[in-house]
Amino acid sequence: GRGRTGKIKITLDTEKLPKLGLTTASVYLSRFLGDKVGEENEIPVSAVLLPDFSHISQQERLNPPAIHLSAEELQMGELESDEKKAHTIIIKNVGKSNLEIRDLQVFNSALGVQLKKRVLKPGASTKLKITAFGQNLKKVKGTPRVLMITNDPNNPKIIIKVKVTSKK
């Protein structure tokens, strides 16, 4: 009846996820055949799939790539709805083997990303340009973020926070 609580167990088969990084979906509850789908019975579900490092060789384990970012948080301040602002982050491979940026995702439409190179040799660097769009900021809940998935076993998931708000 109403006001009672219960538990729902949701199982995720990671083998069936389409790619590394963020995957979001909704699970809808229904009590009766023909129940309508809506916000009242929606359970949003999200998962971040990371690379599996359990099969890497001893050689790879001793000589891993290592990512270094010039910043993991950007301060962009306030934007008008017709304004956009961009910042560039330098990504450097300070490790001993090739660094792969396997996936790059934004958590919402207020941000855009451009990456020059996805594979960096040891010692090499590249530029990641992050742009905030004022017209899409009003829809954003929380802090806009960029998700990066790499083959660095110590940093397979990097989240870059972008501190930006829309002017009222």
Task: Give names to the regions the model predicted.
Residues 1, 14-15, 75-77, 115-120, ...:
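Beta-strand-rich interaction surfaces with strong enrichment in secreted/lumenal proteins
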Residues 1-9, 96-125:
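Surface-exposed binding patches on compact interaction domains or structured appendages
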Residues 8-16, 128-136:
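Short, hydrophobic beta-strand segments
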Residues 13, 30-34, 133, 149-153:
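Beta-strand-rich extracellular modules
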Residues 15-25, 136-143:
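Short glycine/proline/serine/threonine-rich loop/turn segments at secondary-structure transition edges
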Residues 32-90, 94-95, 153-168:
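Long, low-complexity ectodomains and other extracytoplasmic segments of secretory-pathway proteins
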Residues 105, 115-118, 129-132, 157, ...:
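Ser/Thr/Gly/Pro-rich, low-complexity flexible regions
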